From Swiss-Prot:
Organism of provenance: Salmonella typhimurium (strain LT2 / SGSC1412 / ATCC 700720)
Top-rank taxon: Bacteria
Protein name according to UniProt: Uncharacterized protein YigA
PANTHER family: DUF484 DOMAIN-CONTAINING PROTEIN
InterPro entries xref list: DUF484, GAF-like_dom_sf
Encoding gene per record: yigA
């Protein structure tokens, strides 16, 4: 517990600091009148012991400039990434819209992924949200929700996306015909994530890793349902 004398001293110190700051704020000419004294003032420094007030101020200014430059660089990198994302998505959309059938659209989707250096791209649809039964020719796209649920809980949790490896049993659920899959980018399709699953696969086990950006995946997951409805009706 602090003694009354200590509390009084802290109060006086606080008042003195405030008084000094207020005085300097209202009397900026102080620095002109006392230029030599200001130049001789020393400020504690963690490495050099002390530095002059002028050096201290210049160091703060340099740090501020460095922060501004870093922020500007980050903004420019983000703008470049957004531009790249926009054109990549536009390229995909223009390809898929030009398809004359669902089969052709799926081939175009797969080729787009291959052009990016991936093993391929796959769509799987939940049959309780799409009419995939006979006489539909697209029953092979159906993904049993109950069979998928353990994988979803294990890999996605509360997220809409998963990036990383899948084990053998998991691959049999979502990519039963795929071979040499090292890692995947998996996204739940639709605004509520309940329409199906989009999978991009790579033979490289380190290509997709947790923590990578998912903005492109999100945009594709929102774009595809409307295109699919040209050939498959929703339940």
């Amino acid at each position: 517990m602090k003694q009354p004398e200590e509390e009084l001293q802290e109060t006086l110190t606080e008042l003195d600091d405030r008084a000094v700051v207020d005085y300097l704020r209202h009397h900026p000419e102080f620095f002109i009148r006392n230029a030599h004294a200001v130049e001789a003032m020393r400020v504690p420094h963690p490495v050099r012991g002390t530095v002059s007030l002028v050096e201290w101020h210049m160091a703060r200014a340099r740090n501020h400039i460095n922060v501004l430059e870093e922020n500007m660089t980050l903004l420019m990198e983000q703008a470049h990434a957004n531009e790249s994302l926009f054109y990549r998505l536009l390229h995909l959309q223009s390809r898929l819209v030009a398809a004359d059938s669902l089969d052709e659209m799926l081939v175009r989707f797969h080729r787009w992924a291959r052009d990016l250096g991936l093993a391929g791209a796959t769509l799987r649809l939940f049959p309780d949200r799409w009419r995939l039964g006979a006489p539909s020719r697209y029953t092979h796209l159906a993904l049993n929700r109950q069979a998928f649920e353990p994988l979803r809980i294990q890999r996605l949790g509360q997220s809409q996306h998963y990036l990383g490896p899948l084990n053998g049993p998991e691959l049999l659920v979502v990519l039963p015909e795929a071979k040499a899959v090292g890692s995947v980018a998996m996204s739940m399709m639709g605004s509520d994530g309940g329409l199906g699953v989009i999978l991009f696969s790579s033979r490289d086990p380190h290509h997709y890793q947790p923590g990578q950006g998912t903005q492109l995946l999100q945009e594709i997951a929102l774009m595809l349902p409307e295109l699919l409805e040209r050939w498959i009706k929703r339940v």
